[in-house]
Amino acid sequence: MKNILVVTGGCGFVGSNLIQYLLDKTNYKIISLDDYSSGSKKNQINNSRVKYIKGHTKDIGTILKRNIKKINSLFHFGEFARIYQSFLQMDRCIQSNTIGTNAIFNFCLKNKIKLIYSATSASLGNRGNDRNLSPYAFTKAKNLELLENLKKWFDFKY
């Protein structure tokens, strides 16, 4: 039975609020995967249905290996999400938003797990012309482009 939902970035603002919502509205067990680079342990919700794992999205296949068959859906919020800082920490932005997110996409595609991906106005704003304004916006735009291609190539549903 697929009774687990995964939330990457589960200790950030959006992820922690989503976890609370899922606890209130569903009976699923929840796994939060967060590297705590911007999320906080203060955002953890004390509930027996939630398991918090410290780790990077690039390692998702190894980290969740034992739970693959039980995962229903994955909500991906665990990306580097700071526009200004993406200029100062471009390597970290690319590691998270390109390498980590690619691992998430492949994990979901390979294991037929539903993906809910969070886009951003930084890459969608101004009719998509803002995608080259920062490393952050660029990586998010490329991820959306990759998702569209995965949909065409493999009928990947997200």
Explain the meaning of each model-derived region.
Residues M1-Y158:
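N-terminal Rossmann-like NAD(P)+-binding domain of SDR-like oxidoreductases, especially those catalyzing
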